[in-house]
Amino acid sequence: MAKEDVIEVEGTVIEPLPNAMFRVELENGHKILAHVSGKIRMNFIRILPGDKVTVELSPYDLTRGRITYRYK
């Protein structure tokens, strides 16, 4: 899948789940399952409930995504 095919949206982390997964509520009200991208994991960036994040969604499965940025 090419990088241009992703959909970037903003959301808020609702709850942490096992294996670096998070339940994220998007701005439009949908709740999705998101995992942490490799760069965030490599740099040990902590993501807590209530954090505002940017999520990349695949056009093929809109219920799962990848957290690419955590706002300060």
From Swiss-Prot:
Subunit record text: Component of the 30S ribosomal translation pre-initiation complex which assembles on the 30S ribosome in the order IF-2 and IF-3, IF-1 and N-formylmethionyl-tRNA(fMet); mRNA recruitment can occur at any time during PIC assembly.
Keyword line: Cytoplasm, Initiation factor, Phosphoprotein, Protein biosynthesis, RNA-binding, rRNA-binding
Coiled coil: none
SUPFAM superfamilies: Nucleic acid-binding proteins
Protein's cellular compartments: Cytoplasm
Domain S1-like: 1-72
Family designation: Belongs to the IF-1 family.
Chief localisation class: cytoplasm
GO CC annotations, alphabetized: cytosol
Keyword RNA-binding tagged: yes
One annotated GO molecular function: ribosome binding
InterPro entries in alphabetical order: NA-bd_OB-fold, RNA-binding_domain_S1_IF1, S1_domain, TIF_IF1
SMART domains: S1
NCBIfam families reported for this sequence: infA (TIGR00008)
The keyword Repeat is assigned to this record: no
Organism: Shouchella clausii (strain KSM-K16) (Alkalihalobacillus clausii)
Pfam family name, one: eIF-1a
PROSITE patterns: S1_IF1_TYPE
Protein name (Swiss-Prot/TrEMBL): Translation initiation factor IF-1
Free-text function comment from the UniProt entry: One of the essential components for the initiation of protein synthesis. Stabilizes the binding of IF-2 and IF-3 on the 30S subunit to which N-formylmethionyl-tRNA(fMet) subsequently binds. Helps modulate mRNA selection, yielding the 30S pre-initiation complex (PIC). Upon addition of the 50S ribosomal subunit IF-1, IF-2 and IF-3 are released leaving the mature 70S translation initiation complex.
Modified residues (Phosphotyrosine): Y60
